[in-house]
Design a protein with these regions (language model features):
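Charge-rich, low-complexity N-terminal segments
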Residues: 30-157
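Sec-dependent N-terminal signal peptides
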Residues: 10-18
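Short acidic-hydrophobic surface loop/beta-edge motif
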Residues: 33-40, 181-183, 209-211
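Signature of long, low-cysteine stretches enriched in small and polar/charged residues
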Residues: 149-203
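Long, compositionally biased interface segments
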Residues: 196-249
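N-terminal secretory signal peptides that target proteins for export/translocation
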Residues: 1-11
Length: 249
């Protein structure tokens, strides 16, 4: 299963590379040379093109719809998705060759910025969504991890397999596990982390930080390997500083 998943990921990355060669000149055509520009909630953001992975998406047709390259672009257009990679911890443009090679376990940060259309100023609603009761999911008791400064709960979802998975079969599994971490400040949740489980190796391997930047009307997602979780405060802070530094005044 894991080998198949890795094969699928490699195929998807190859497909994205081909699309990138076709789309990139059109996507960046209406931006200042070497930069990608657009708006989030009226705030103009311009970032060096070297940070962009694949392509930025603008309001209009989705990137899988014919004619989407004709969407309005540039500083007067609204972003719908701004995907980037950055090295860690210096937040320089990420090495794309490493990104394509390492995939989900990329050694830097993968950042995606999207418009935020809710009135919330924090991410409490997403924590509550992750912890909602479902018939096929069970939750361990919530604990507080002092050395991280985060609450944690593990959620397990049973996967129906046919034929049933044999207990000692190392290559099949019937559970999907997520680890949810979050911080709390005065009862509100400024950031939540969704960490993915690698069943054959029985370990968490990648986390997604989700937080709101109300000052620019954006939802921010940052993906990183589990080893960086103890640095979560720096990851959130430096990502915020990076994004704010690219707002055009």
């Amino acid at each position: 299963m894991v080998l198949m998943n890795k094969f699928i990921v490699r195929c998807l990355i190859s497909l994205f590379k081909i699309m990138l060669l076709i789309i990139s000149p059109l996507t960046f055509a209406e931006n200042r040379p070497g930069f990608v520009c657009g708006k989030f909630n009226g705030h103009v953001m311009e970032v060096p093109k070297k940070y962009i992975i694949y392509w930025a998406e603008y309001e209009g047709k989705s990137s899988w719809t014919p004619g989407f390259t004709k969407n309005k672009k540039g500083c007067d257009a609204n972003f719908t998705s701004l995907p980037m990679i950055a090295s860690w911890p210096d937040m320089q443009p990420g090495d794309k060759s490493k990104w394509y090679k390492q995939g989900l376990e990329y050694e830097g940060l993968r950042i995606r910025v999207e418009p935020f259309r809710r009135s919330d100023i924090d991410i409490t609603y997403k924590r509550d969504f992750f912890l909602r009761k479902q018939n096929d999911r069970t939750f361990d008791p919530v604990i507080y991890i002092d050395n991280l400064g985060l609450f944690f709960v593990e959620a397990t979802r049973k996967i129906a397999r046919f034929p049933p998975v044999e207990k000692n079969d190392p290559y099949r599994f019937d559970e999907d596990v997520n680890g949810y971490y979050w911080a709390e400040v005065n009862g509100r949740v400024p950031v939540v982390f969704d960490c993915q489980w690698l069943p054959l190796e029985k370990r968490y391997y990648i986390c997604e930080a989700i937080f709101v930047m109300a000052e620019i009307g954006s939802l921010v997602r940052v993906f990183f390997t589990i080893e960086k979780l103890p640095q979560w405060r720096a990851i959130v802070s430096r990502t915020q500083q990076f994004l704010l530094s690219h707002i055009k005044r």
